Regions:
Chain A
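Short, surface-exposed beta-strand/loop micro-motifs that present aromatic residues
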Residues: 164-171
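N-terminal beta1-alpha1 ligand-phosphate binding loop
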Residues: 2-24, 180-184
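Structural motif
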Residues: 42-44
C-alpha cells in the first residue's frame, strides 16, 4: 500500500487514478500509523511552500516523514512535494524544508515566462532504473514557478531546460523527486510511476 | 524545449458536449468523457471544459463529469463556467481538475483571483477574458457569455490579472469566435507583449495555418479550438505534423 499524504489543497485524485490504472494500491491519508505501515510514501503538492510545510507541521507529520525516510522506505515527492524534500526554499521568504536532500529552491529566472507551464523534454543525466523505457527528450508536463537551484550533482537523474537547467527527476537513495506531474504526463508519466512502483515491489 | 500546446475545448451543457456560434445556436456534439479520451489518444496537450449552463442544479452533474474525465485521461485539464467562490474552486480541484478558469466572477470580485492564487497556487488559476473590439486596437471585456460590456480595457485587465496572481490567461476573441477565419492575432499579440504568463488564444480557428499564425505571429503559448476538432475538420496528429514542419515545437510522441 502506498500512502499518499493528503495535507490540503490540489488535485490528488488524478494521482490516485493513475496508480489504480497501474494496479498499485494507494490511499489518501494523514494518519501516522497508516504512513508507517505503508510500503512507500508519495508527497504530492501544489500551492505555496510555506503553506505546505505549515500544513505538515500542523498534522505533526514532519518527524514521521523524516523517520520513514531514514528507515529506507521509498518516498516520491511530486512538484512541490519534491521541493519540500530539500533544505530550504526562498519562495516568498526563507523557509526550512524537510532536509532529506541537500540543496535549495529558488524562483525560475525572469528571462522566461513564469510559471513554467506545459510539456517540456527530459535530458537524462545518469543511467537509472527510474528512467527505464523513458526515451531521451520524452515530454512530461510541468507547472511550477520555483525550482531546485542548488543540489548535489550525483542526485540529478534527469533535467529540463527552461531559463536554465531545471532538475526534473532527482534521487538520493530511497528519496525520489519529480518536478513535473507524472500523473498528468500521458503514457510517459504512467511509465515513470510504474518504474517507481517496481522499486517498491 | 517547451512545446506549444494544442487545446481542444469542450462546452458542456447538462452533462453533454455542445457547440454554438458566437455563443448562440447551441448544438449537441458528444459525451464529454468519450470525447476527452479521443482527444487524449490523438495527442491533445490539454483540455478545457466549460460548464455553459452553470446553474446550481446542474453543478453536481458537471462535477461528476470532471471526476469521470480525470479517471480516464492522464493529461491536464482546466474547468470553467460558474466558478464564483473559493469553495467552487476547491470542489472542482478535488473532483480532479488541474486548473480553474475564472471569467465573469473575477470582474465582479478581482480579489477571488488573489485569494485563489494564494490558497491553491497561481498555476491552477486561469483568467479567462472575453474581449470584443470597440475601435481599432482597442478591446473591451464582455461578461455573461458575451452579452454584457463591462467597458474595461482587455489589455489592462490582463495585466491586472497577472498582478493578482493568475498563472495563465485565456483570451477569447468574441468578434471572430465560430467564424473559422483565423484567430485574432492583434489582440493575442497585444496581450502576449504585456504579460509574462502563458497565453492561450481562443476563437476563430478554421485551418492548420490559423494555428501556426497565432502560435508564431500572435505570440500565443497555446491555441484553443472546439468545432474544428469536434467535427473532425482538423485531426490533431495532422495539425502537429504541419506545425512541426512550420518550425513550431510541438509534442508529437504521446
Amino acid at each position: 500500500m502506498i500512502a499518499i499524504i493528503d495535507y490540503g489543497a490540489g488535485n490528488i485524485k488524478s494521482l490516485q487514478f493513475a496508480l489504480t490504472k497501474l494496479e498499485l494500491d494507494s490511499c489518501l491519508t494523514t494518519d501516522k500509523q497508516t504512513i508507517e505501515n505503508a510500503t512507500a510514501i508519495i508527497l504530492p503538492g501544489v500551492g505555496a511552500f510555506k503553506d505546505a510545510i505549515e500544513a505538515l507541521g500542523e498534522l505533526d507529520l514532519i518527524r514521521t516523514i523524516q523517520q520513514e525516510a531514514s528507515s529506507g522506505k521509498p518516498l516520491l515527492g511530486i512538484c512541490l512535494g519534491m521541493q519540500l524534500f530539500y533544505e530550504r526554499s526562498y519562495e516568498d521568504g526563507d523557509w526550512q524544508g524537510l532536509g532529506l536532500i541537500q540543496g535549495d529552491v529558488k524562483r525560475i529566472a525572469e528571462s522566461v515566462k513564469v510559471p513554467h507551464m506545459g510539456w517540456n523534454t527530459l535530458s537524462h543525466r545518469q543511467k537509472n532504473p527510474l528512467l527505464s523505457n523513458i526515451k531521451e527528450n520524452a515530454y512530461v508536463y510541468f507547472v511550477h514557478s520555483y525550482a531546485v537551484s542548488s543540489y548535489q550533482k550525483e542526485d540529478l537523474v534527469s533535467s529540463a531546460d527552461y531559463g536554465g537547467m531545471v532538475p526534473a527527476v532527482v534521487q538520493k537513495e530511497n528519496i525520489i523527486g519529480m518536478q513535473f506531474h507524472p500523473e498528468k504526463s500521458g503514457e510517459v508519466g504512467l511509465q515513470l510511476l510504474q518504474n517507481f512502483g517496481e522499486m517498491i515491489s | 524545449m517547451l512545446a506549444k500546446r494544442i487545446v481542444p475545448c469542450l462546452d458542456v451543457d447538462k452533462g453533454r458536449v455542445v457547440k454554438g456560434r458566437k455563443f448562440q445556436n447551441i448544438q449537441d456534439v458528444d459525451d464529454p468523457v468519450d470525447l476527452a479520451k479521443k482527444y487524449n489518444q490523438a495527442g491533445a496537450d490539454e483540455l478545457v471544459f466549460y460548464d455553459i449552463t452553470a446553474s446550481n442544479e446542474n453543478r453536481n452533474i458537471f462535477l461528476d463529469v470532471v471526476e469521470n474525465v480525470a479517471a480516464e485521461i492522464a493529461i491536464p485539464f482546466s474547468v470553467g463556467g460558474g466558478i464564483r467562490t473559493i469553495t467552487d474552486i476547491h470542489q472542482t480541484l478535488r473532483a480532479g481538475a488541474d486548473k480553474v478558469s475564472i471569467n465573469s466572477a473575477a470582474i465582479k470580485n478581482p480579489q477571488l483571483i488573489k485569494d485563489a492564487a494564494l490558497k491553491f497556487g497561481s498555476q491552477c488559476v486561469v483568467l479567462s477574458i472575453d474581449a470584443k473590439a470597440v475601435s481599432e486596437n482597442t478591446w473591451q471585456v464582455y461578461i455573461n457569455g458575451g452579452r454584457t460590456n463591462t467597458e474595461i480595457d482587455a489589455i489592462g485587465w490582463a495585466i491586472k490579472g497577472e498582478q493578482l496572481g493568475a498563472g495563465e490567461i485565456v483570451i477569447n476573441a468574441i468578434d471572430v469566435d465560430g467564424e473559422k477565419n483565423g484567430y485574432n492575432l492583434e489582440l493575442t499579440r497585444a496581450i502576449a507583449d504585456k504579460v509574462n504568463i502563458p497565453i492561450i488564444a481562443s476563437g476563430g480557428a478554421g485551418t492548420k495555418e490559423h494555428f501556426a499564425n497565432v502560435l508564431q505571429k500572435g505570440g500565443a503559448d497555446a491555441a484553443l479550438a472546439a468545432s474544428v476538432f469536434h467535427y473532425s475538420e482538423i485531426q490533431i496528429p495532422d495539425l502537429k505534423e504541419y506545425l512541426a514542419a512550420s518550425n513550431i515545437i510541438v509534442r508529437r510522441e504521446i
